[in-house]
């Protein structure tokens, strides 16, 4: 359990562990410049617990901005079941709800890739330093050393069947 209240558990093995090191050197390897992280997707339905975003965490997709107020997520059977907080929670709820294809569609609320930043050249404060242009920061914000990347939505990159535009990436 983290000091902020994050207490998330999940099983792995259904999907591969993927690395991004900044260049594609073999056929079929997805990568982008500024890489330096490792991630995987939890087994379907296995994620349970609580995730808490704190001020200073980064919503890299879709907004490319720092979190301003705490957001608490409750996760059961691989899906977010509750989003509590202020403006940042409302932004997340609205974005994920808008990504649904029907009232029964839960895909935007599914836990997607989870990873860790490992690039000593990536800067947590890059958005504050250079502005919030997504094309400049989406890679580096995912890879600054020590972050845990939490995301929702699609899992097709890892071989899954969930393809939704309701995608959220938050390096914490």
Which role fits each region the language model picked out?
Residues 45, 49, 113-115, 152-156, ...:
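Extended interaction regions within the primary functional domain
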Residues 8-11, 18-21, 60-63, 82-84, ...:
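Short helix/loop capping segments that flank catalytic or ligand/cofactor-binding pockets
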Residues 15, 56-58, 79-80, 87-88, ...:
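Short, glycine-/Ser/Thr-/acidic-enriched flexible segments
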Residues 44, 73, 104-107:
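Generic structural signal for beta-strand residues in well-ordered domains
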Residues 145-172:
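Intrinsically disordered terminal and processing segments
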Residues 66-67, 82-152:
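Dual-mode signal for accessory low-complexity, basic/Gly-rich regions
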Residues 1, 71-83, 148, 172:
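Short polybasic amphipathic segments
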Residues 1-52, 56-69, 76:
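Active-site bordering "gate/hinge" segments
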